[in-house]
Amino acid sequence: MRIALGLQYDGSPYAGWQTQLHQPTIQDELEKALTAFIGEEAKAFPVHTITAGRTDTGVHALGQVVHFDTNVGREDFSWVRGVNTFLPKSIVVNWAKEVPEEFSARFSAYERTYIYALHAGPCRSPIVNARAGYLMLPPDQFLDVEAMKKSAECLIGEHDFSSFRSSECQSKTPVKTIYAIDIISQEPWVYFRIRGNAFLHHMIRNIVGCFLQIGQGRQQSGWMAEVLTAKNRQIAAPTFMADGLYLAKIKYPEEFAIPQPWLENAWLPTNVIGK
């Protein structure tokens, strides 16, 4: 049978989602917990998880979805309670659900939402250390939010996002579709919410880096379109820090009845998380 899980995690202690040699990863922690909960049966049927989004080092998740195959039957909440018993405090399973064999956490997803939380001001906040990005600004200055919003317009739709693509990206194509970008200002915070069908490696962080160049007045709002058209990573801004990036939501066809993520326990404002 195939089981889907909904996860939340603090990505700061980990070298990303995917298993890596001699590095702590979320996939390893989850598979160890699943193996411990399943018990002896896991020896004959090892656990291997497939995820909707392979988050990078330091990136967090509010609504990650994974699936795995098993020959062990459990009630849905038994998976939640049992697996959480073996997980570190930085990772939690919010829900579990048996799904049909044709469901894939990765390939069945048709929309993903990321949120980037940025604190901008003269002093960083130790309270949200590793939970938010930080940009040092003088006390009497703030980002030009309207200029950033204007620059975002050119990114909506289907485009070749090569200028925002990491050299390590394994995607077969740089062409992706962005459905919406919302920039929400609540000084000293700015939140970037981006919805799309899929994203390239470092794509969100590279876009945020460009937004901040424009928000600080170092580039005009029209510069974003120039970067997009160039299809050249060297033209864009440096990759911004991972700390403030959250995989917030993933959407699937209604036929799979995948639960919505539990966002009420996230520290982000309600108007940022959205519906």
Swiss-Prot record:
Record-listed substrate binding positions: Y114
A Pfam family of this chain: PseudoU_synth_1
Recorded superkingdom: Bacteria
Transmembrane segments: none
Assigned EC number: 5.4.99.12
InterPro entries: PsdUridine_synth_cat_dom_sf (IPR020103), PsdUridine_synth_TruA (IPR001406), PsdUridine_synth_TruA_a/b_dom (IPR020097), PsdUridine_synth_TruA_C (IPR020095), TruA/RsuA/RluB/E/F_N (IPR020094)
Entry keyword annotation includes Transmembrane: no
Protein name (record): tRNA pseudouridine synthase A
Originating species: Polynucleobacter asymbioticus (strain DSM 18221 / CIP 109841 / QLW-P1DMWA-1) (Polynucleobacter necessarius subsp. asymbioticus)
Higher taxonomy: Bacteria, Pseudomonadati, Pseudomonadota, Betaproteobacteria, Burkholderiales
